[in-house]
Structures are given as structure tokens and as C-alpha cells.
Amino acid sequence: MSKYLIINADDFGYNPQQTKAIDELMRGKLITSTSLMTVAPDAANAAELARLGGYPVGVHLTINSDDSKNRWQSNSGAPSLSEKGMGLYESQVGLALHARRRDVRAELEAQYNFISSRGVEVDHAEIGRAHV
């Protein structure tokens, strides 16, 4: 059985700078996969780069926002995951107090569909930090 090392770059789509850096690393074959954060501002651009490059891509499951100034928006529009008019909860406590199981499930499915509907095959899922 052969062995190989997987080097995955996290947070593809987080912002234009990070998207560009990950794209360059993928094209240079310095990393072997990436995880796309579909609720982040540059997600659509990252998905298009992944499709064009044929990159191995996972979905970075995210149900809260890291950015307090520019709150990320839900892919599903699930009401219990967002503070009124502000986007996804920044606080894990706020999320835990309000999130409904069916909304969490709908959001995770919407994040998978965000990628797959753009012609990119999702080959793994990732959860990190406090996102899920």
C-alpha cells in the first residue's frame, strides 16, 4: 500500500487575498487540496477557481461568523442561525441559544450544494475552530 501526504489549505474563499494565495499554491502543486468556506465573501470566486483548476475541494462547514464587522451570511437563509439583519452569529453562545436543528441541517446541506451546484466535486468535509 502506498502512502502519501495530504496538505490541505483551509478557508478557501475567506477573502480575495487568501483565495489568491490558495489558488497559487494549488496551481504550483505545493498543496494537495483545499476547503471552501461557502459563507465567506469570496466563496463564489473560489468555487470558480476550483472548478477551472479541477482542484480537490472539501466543504468547510460554517455556522457562525469570524468577522464581527462584516458578518457572513447563511447560504440557506435559515432564520435561527442569524441575528436579525446582521448575519450569522459571531458568538457561540448566541448560536447555541437560538439555532434549531432543522436549520443547522438545512444550512450544512446548502453549503455542500453551494459547491456542487457550481460544478465542483466535494471530496471531504471539514469542521474547524468554532464554525460547527
Annotate the PLM regions.
Residues 1-16, 22:
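Boundary/entry segment of secreted carbohydrate-active catalytic domains
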Residues 4-6, 31-35, 54-60, 122-126:
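Structural preference for beta-strand elements that scaffold enzyme active sites
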Residues 102-127:
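CE4/NodB-like, metal-dependent polysaccharide N-deacetylase domain
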Residues 130-132:
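Conserved small/polar residues in nucleotide/adenosyl-binding loops
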